[in-house]
Amino acid sequence: MKTQVLVVLVLCVVFCLAESRNSMTSEERGLVSLMRQRDDIAKRLQCKCKGDAPDLSHMSGTIYFSCEGGDNSWKKCNSISVFADCCHKKPT
């Protein structure tokens, strides 16, 4: 009986520690969101399609591993690297 109680207690402690490591504060979530936005902007700056204006707000491209995947509404306009293409929306 003592062993069972000890096992349950240890499992509770382990579960509580795991949960505390996974929970983020609102400040941490905000920081993660800002980092993702910064990464998105950096990717957009790398992705320039022919005819795009030099400022970020007029760039039409976005980076994908393959422009032909998904809903087939994107067209390759540039290559960023061996693993990534710069794609923009196909005209409708």
UniProtKB/Swiss-Prot annotation:
The keyword Ubl conjugation does not apply. It is found in: Secreted; Nematocyst. Disulfide bonds join 47-86, 49-77, 67-87. Keywords: Cleavage on pair of basic residues, Disulfide bond, Ion channel impairing toxin, Nematocyst, Neurotoxin, Secreted, Signal, Toxin, Voltage-gated sodium channel impairing toxin. It comes from the Eukaryota. Gene3D superfamilies: Anthopleurin-A. Residues 21-42 form a propeptide. Residues 1-20 form the signal peptide. Expressed both outside and in acontia, a specialised envenomation structure laden with batteries of venom-containing nematocysts found only in the superfamily Metridioidea. In neuromuscular preparation of crustaceans, the toxin increased neurotransmitter release, causing repetitive firing of the axons. May affect sodium channels (Nav). Belongs to the sea anemone sodium channel inhibitory toxin family. This is Calitoxin. It comes from Calliactis polypus.
